[in-house]
Every structure is written in structure tokens, then in C-alpha cells.
Amino acid sequence: MISIEKFEIFGREIWIAVFFEEKIDGVTFSLDGCEYLMERINSLKALLERRNVSVNLAEEKSDYPKIVYNVLVGDIENQDALRFLSFRGVTPFEKKVYEVLTKKVKRGSVITYGELAKMLSTSPRAVGNAMKRNPYPIIVPCHRVVLKSGLGDYTPKREYKQFLLEIEGVKGWTS
């Protein structure tokens, strides 16, 4: 099922969509309106289906979008929200990356791909690939992973990464 809700933060609308069964299978969001959210939903649906996670597009009201929003604004700690995630379709390596990132890199801070890779005894490229395939943005804070030389990319848009870091009060990585 899918639950969609619109919130406002820092004077901007944010649309949050959550795929779920008993737990969250995937999260996506848009700062560019409902139409763009539909594109993001289709991308997430494709990612989940490639991972053999069945997706039901029937809309059903749930608390999950509000939980994601509460993580975004800091009312719920990221690591406390991990319990809501199903991790269905996520590889054991990706799960480890997501858990380490979420537990070790707190709100208001960033880590480089290389630093996170060192913590996991892997390569920065492997960490980057896991971040690119993260089905749980905001809860698993892939926006907190940056290049040594600057902000780096972000799916769906680099501007979204900047916005998320600004919300968290991160200085120096958002310009």
C-alpha cells in the first residue's frame, strides 16, 4: 500500500509518500509538488520491484508519512525510526551500511564516503552505490554523506540534499 501526505517545513511544501505492508518498504518525497512526487513514486516502485518487493499502489492512510516527517524535523531520532523499516529487498551489505550510517552520523553532522567506508572496511564506491539505492531517504540519512571535496550528488536532486542539511543546521556543506 501507499500513504501520501503533504507537510510544510521552512515555508516549503514537502510531499512524503511511503510504501508499506506491516513495515515501511520505501520512502520518497518531493519539494516540487505532487506531480513530481508521482515521478518519484514511479522510480521507487521500479527500484522495489527490481528487488522483488511487491508494491501495491492502493492508497491507505497510515502514520508512516508523519513518522518520516517527524524524523525530518528532529522530533524522532533517525536510529529510533529504524524499527519501522522492513529492509525487504535490501542486501545484507546495504542494511549494514544503512544501520551504521543511521546510528553513527547524527543530525547536524556529515561524513565523507571515505570515512564511512573506513568504518565499514569497504570502498567509498561501495558506500556510494548503497546510498544511491537507499529506499529509505530521510530515515536513513544518505544526505549526510558527502564528498571530501564538497556536497556530492543526491537522488532525486542535489537541491534536496542541500535543503535537508539546512533543516538539520549543517553549516559549510550546503553552498
Swiss-Prot record:
Q: Which residues cross the membrane?
A: none
Matching entries from CDD domains are given as: ATase
Major location (coarse): cytoplasm
SUPFAM superfamilies associated with the record: Methylated DNA-protein cysteine methyltransferase domain, Methylated DNA-protein cysteine methyltransferase, C-terminal domain
Recorded catalytic reaction(s): these are:
a 6-O-methyl-2'-deoxyguanosine in DNA + L-cysteinyl-[protein] = S-methyl-L-cysteinyl-[protein] + a 2'-deoxyguanosine in DNA; a 4-O-methyl-thymidine in DNA + L-cysteinyl-[protein] = a thymidine in DNA + S-methyl-L-cysteinyl-[protein]
**EC number, as in UniProt:** 2.1.1.63
Key word Lipid metabolism present? no
Q: Can you say where in the cell this protein is located?
A: Cytoplasm
What Pfam family is a match, any one? MGMT_N
Q: Name one GO biological process term.
A: DNA alkylation repair
From which domain of life does this come? Archaea
Q: Does the keyword DNA-binding apply?
A: no
Q: Residues in the active site?
A: 142
Enzyme class label: transferase
Q: State any single GO MF term.
A: methylated-DNA-[protein]-cysteine S-methyltransferase activity
InterPro entries per the UniProt record, alphabetical: DNA_protcyst_Mta_Thcoc (IPR054936), MethylDNA_cys_MeTrfase_AS (IPR001497), MethylDNA_cys_MeTrfase_DNA-bd (IPR014048), MethylDNA_cys_MeTrfase_DNAb (IPR036217), MGMT (IPR023546), MGMT_N (IPR015236), MGMT_N_sf (IPR036631), WH-like_DNA-bd_sf (IPR036388)
| Alphabetical keyword list | Cytoplasm, DNA damage, DNA repair, Methyltransferase, Transferase
Xref: HAMAP family: OGT
Q: What does this protein do?
A: Involved in the cellular defense against the biological effects of O6-methylguanine (O6-MeG) and O4-methylthymine (O4-MeT) in DNA. Repairs the methylated nucleobase in DNA by stoichiometrically transferring the methyl group to a cysteine residue in the enzyme. This is a suicide reaction: the enzyme is irreversibly inactivated.
Question: NCBIfam families recorded for this chain?
Answer: DNA_protcyst_Mta_Thcoc (NF041132), ogt (TIGR00589), PRK03887.1 (NF003022)
Note the PANTHER family from the entry. METHYLATED-DNA--PROTEIN-CYSTEINE METHYLTRANSFERASE
Q: What else is known?
A: This enzyme catalyzes only one turnover and therefore is not strictly catalytic. According to one definition, an enzyme is a biocatalyst that acts repeatedly and over many reaction cycles.
What name appears for this protein in its UniProt entry? Methylated-DNA--protein-cysteine methyltransferase
